[in-house]
Amino acid sequence: EITTRLVGSEMCIRDSYRLVAPKFFEEAIEEINIDNVIVRPSYLSICQADQRYYQGKRASDVLEEKLPMALIHEGVGEVVFDNTGSFDVGDKVVMIPNTPTKEDEYISANYLPSSKFRGSGFDGFTSDLIQLNPDRLVKLPDNFNLKISAFIELISVICHGIDRFEKIAIKHKNRFGVWGDGNLGYITALLLKEFYPESEVTVIGKHGENLNLFSFADKTYKFHEVPDDLAIDHGFECVGSNASQAAIDQIINTINPQGSIILFGVSEYPIPINTRLILEKGLTIQGISRSERKDFLKVVGLLKNNPNLFDSLDKLISEVVTIKSLNDLKEAFDKDYISGFGKTILVWDK
């Protein structure tokens, strides 16, 4: 029915839910051109970045500049129209939020200031129809769990970070430390065990109930109970916010000389770091943000070849909320905000 409607006209009506002010969504009806690939979202996932907009925790000038805006940059959907010959109607696809406008020989598109990113100054996926270029989509195998596939974007960021780490790190990779017991830390530790099965992965966090879920980790410690003799070769910071200061400080103190520190967490405000020890130990610090198509392809291939990972990732799903109205979307964000652990999945039924 929707395909017939799309093919029968050069324009189509799209219904979007946009955040216009903190904690306030509005419905927007607009016309879009029928071109490239059009996807109907099926499962979306709320990210901490979405919450920072929803809760009004971004700087006031940032909110003024970027709102109104449709949120959400993690999601999967179904192809309903394609005039590029890249997909069949009905194909299940994961959507890539980064949208390059230029190419650079040396800089990855996810770091180019010219790139647009869904849900960050550019409408995200809370619409009944999404128009994308075919290279912003990756087809999913028929047997994939779509609720888990909804946050492939998050997994792809971690894959991207581990790939960049591999290019700069010294060969000594016997002991990894992961700081953070939330979604980011969970997936990072899981993938490190997958990519480096012979290495020891230690997770340091704040919440005992969260750390209990890291059954695949070799060791877990609460932040204030880390033994004095803990030594790691490389550290992954997955904390974010102001708390990342203490996490980075502990990584610097426990890491071996010439180790690498990978920063995943986002802090809205600058934090001090111990440059003296960084210099003394000859450490390398690398920041990670977003991902690109090759990272999505890697994740889809990884999940296809290692279906057991779905069982571990399923533990991350804490809430599943069906979205049929603006109030449903607000309720989902409110539930997600008070959730201590896990991902909130939106079943998009608009």
Language-model features: where?
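Single conserved hydrophobic/aromatic residue that forms the stacking wall/gate
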Residues: 1-13
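Glycine-rich beta-strand-centered segment in the early N-terminal region that forms part
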Residues: 30-44, 59-102, 141-143
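Glycine-rich cofactor phosphate-binding loops and adjacent beta1-alpha1 units
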Residues: 167-174, 195-196, 211-284
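Mid-domain Rossmann-like dinucleotide-binding core that forms the NAD(H)/NADP(H) cofactor-binding site
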Residues: 144-224
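Residue-level marker of beta-strand positions
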Residues: 74-76, 91-92, 129, 181, ...
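C-terminal hydrophobic helical "lid"/dimerization subdomain
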Residues: 249, 293-350
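NAD(P)H dinucleotide-binding glycine-rich loop of Rossmann-like/cofactor-binding domains
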Residues: 99-175
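Short glycine-/small-residue-rich Rossmann-like dinucleotide-binding loops
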Residues: 45, 83, 98, 239-243, ...
